[in-house]
Amino acid sequence: YLFVMTNRMKLLNYSFEGLPNLKKLDEIMRQHPAVKRVLEQEGAPHTLTD
Protein backbone atom coordinates (compact mmCIF):
# COMPACT_ATOMS: atom_id res chain seq x y z
CA TYR A 1 0.00 0.00 0.00
CA LEU A 2 2.88 2.36 0.69
CA PHE A 3 4.05 2.09 -2.93
CA VAL A 4 0.56 3.07 -4.07
CA MET A 5 0.89 6.20 -1.95
CA THR A 6 4.38 7.07 -3.24
CA ASN A 7 3.15 6.49 -6.79
CA ARG A 8 0.27 8.90 -6.16
CA MET A 9 2.74 11.42 -4.69
CA LYS A 10 4.69 11.31 -7.95
CA LEU A 11 1.54 11.75 -10.03
CA LEU A 12 0.57 14.79 -7.96
CA ASN A 13 4.11 16.21 -8.15
CA TYR A 14 4.62 16.06 -4.38
CA SER A 15 8.24 16.34 -3.34
CA PHE A 16 10.10 13.57 -1.58
CA GLU A 17 12.31 16.24 -0.02
CA GLY A 18 12.86 15.36 3.61
CA LEU A 19 11.52 11.84 3.00
CA PRO A 20 14.61 9.90 1.91
CA ASN A 21 13.26 6.52 3.02
CA LEU A 22 10.05 6.93 1.00
CA LYS A 23 12.06 8.04 -2.01
CA LYS A 24 14.32 4.98 -1.71
CA LEU A 25 11.33 2.65 -1.32
CA ASP A 26 9.76 4.11 -4.47
CA GLU A 27 13.01 3.71 -6.42
CA ILE A 28 13.48 0.10 -5.27
CA MET A 29 9.88 -0.87 -6.01
CA ARG A 30 10.06 0.57 -9.53
CA GLN A 31 13.05 -1.70 -10.26
CA HIS A 32 11.09 -4.92 -9.63
CA PRO A 33 10.10 -6.65 -12.88
CA ALA A 34 6.59 -7.43 -11.59
CA VAL A 35 5.99 -3.80 -10.65
CA LYS A 36 7.24 -2.66 -14.06
CA ARG A 37 4.80 -5.06 -15.76
CA VAL A 38 1.85 -3.86 -13.70
CA LEU A 39 2.63 -0.19 -14.34
CA GLU A 40 2.91 -0.95 -18.07
CA GLN A 41 -0.41 -2.83 -18.05
CA GLU A 42 -2.16 -0.02 -16.21
CA GLY A 43 -1.16 2.41 -18.92
CA ALA A 44 -1.17 6.16 -18.64
CA PRO A 45 -2.16 7.58 -15.26
CA HIS A 46 -5.55 9.19 -14.95
CA THR A 47 -7.04 11.72 -12.58
CA LEU A 48 -10.35 11.99 -10.82
CA THR A 49 -11.38 14.65 -13.33
CA ASP A 50 -10.73 12.53 -16.46
UniProtKB/Swiss-Prot annotation:
pH dependence (record): Optimum pH is 6.
SUPFAM superfamilies in the cross-refs: GST C-terminal domain-like
Reactions accelerated catalytically: RX + glutathione = an S-substituted glutathione + a halide anion + H(+)
UniProt signal peptide: none
Keywords on record: Transferase
EC number(s) from the headed UniProt entry: 2.5.1.18
Top EC category: transferase
GO MF entries: glutathione transferase activity
Stated regulation of activity: Inhibited by Fe(2+) and DTT. Slightly inhibited by SDS and Zn(2+). Activity is slightly increased by Mn(2+).
InterPro entries: Glutathione-S-Trfase_C_sf (IPR036282)
Annotated family: Belongs to the GST superfamily.
Protein role: Glutathione S-transferase, which conjugates reduced glutathione to a wide number of exogenous and endogenous hydrophobic electrophiles.
Protein name (record): Glutathione S-transferase
Species name: Lactiplantibacillus plantarum
Classification of source organism: Bacteria, Bacillati, Bacillota, Bacilli, Lactobacillales
